[in-house]
Amino acid sequence: MLKYTDYDIVFQEIPDEVTLAINLSNCPNRCKGCHSPYLQQNVGELLTEENLSILLQKYGKAVTCVCFMGGDADPYDVAYFADFLQRQQIAPVKVGWYSGKPKLPAEFPIQNFQYIKLGPYLENRGNLKSEHTNQRLYKITQEKMDDITYRFRQLSLIHISEPTRRVVI
């Protein structure tokens, strides 16, 4: 059973999407240098279809994607809720999952997702913006996983110039 601790609307986890990122607890990966070690504990509120529906009613018009951050202790439950998000009628959203595992479990239903990030965080390899990262973000189309990790390096080339506050690419 999945529990979530908090959520936020984010702009960088999934390229070109405004994402409702839901942090799931009870992470079994214990990555050295973890940015959210509190998620290693089995804490938070039970994730339910009702809770997801409430979040969609509140934020559905503002977001284009819902991304589960974690959930490696119960990957098939993550897939269940991804399927729910695909079927619900409150707000059409894409679905993503950030997993810290190096690969998906056997018979995992990738058709429930539009995005999946795989790979543990390794301090010496960096995050998705690092050209040396072991992590990969995949876009799922027609049950094929296309690696779009390069998009994070493109995004990191964008910066705000100080004097005019305009975006420079």
What are these regions (language model features)?
Residues I158-I169:
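Single conserved hydrophobic/aromatic residue that forms the stacking wall/gate
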Residues G60, P105-R125:
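Structural recognition of alpha->loop->beta junctions
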Residues S130-L157:
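Functionally critical loop-and-helix segments that line ligand-binding/catalytic clefts
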Residues A62-L85, E131-T133:
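Conserved glycine-rich "GG(E/T)P / GGGxP" loop and the immediately following alpha-helix
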Residues Q41-I54, A73-Q111:
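Canonical radical SAM enzyme core domain
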Residues L39, G71, P120-Y121:
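Flexible loop residues that form catalytic
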Residues M1-N23, P28, S36-Q41:
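N-terminal [4Fe-4S]-dependent radical SAM core
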Residues N26, G33, E162:
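Short, cysteine/histidine-rich loop/knuckle motifs that typically chelate Zn2+
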